Amino acid sequence: MLRHKEPYVLYRKLLGFYPTDIYLYEQACLHRSSSICEQGRRINNERLEFLGDAILDAIVADILFHKFKTSKEGFLTNTRAKIVKRESLNEIAVKLGLDNFITYSMRTSSHNNYMFGNAFEALIGAIYLDKGYRYCKKFVETRIIDPYIDLEKISKEEFNFKSRLIEWGQKHKVDIEFALIETIVDQDNNPVFLSLIHISEPTRLLS
């Protein structure tokens, strides 16, 4: 009996609550390099990652909307982007201890910089399916925002859109090239760079 209870206890320590459908959380921690086959389908965390990405964006937007009541859309969008960028999600995943739950091929870990952040998004997707939006938002607020993210501080940090675009390209396996077209000076005498961005077709990996 203890063997059956142990996963629930471990996930309780990670999440702060007992999961109802533990299968969702186990799937959230299953990297594509260790996919399993069930009824002819490959099972891994990619679908949950897709869902969690959207849910996390919505939750962070919700939190920022009520936190910064007079701020404009551009400010809110930039602040959200800084919170959900891949480097931040990787760090949060490690601080939570999520990295200890992920099942993956050892040869994958050496060159997958975003595995932990991707698993974190999958975890958000699992919580949403298991407990609903309100519960998921509470998890983000109490287990992520409150202990690890200073909203006032991060809202004032400069944001590098070029790095964000490169990060997006790496996640979706597309090559991005930048070509400087023109340099001008704005009304405050700051340089403004106009660049042309070329995005290639996604790379399809055979497995």
List each language-model region with its residue ranges.
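Double-stranded RNA-binding/processing signature
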Residues: 1-200, 204
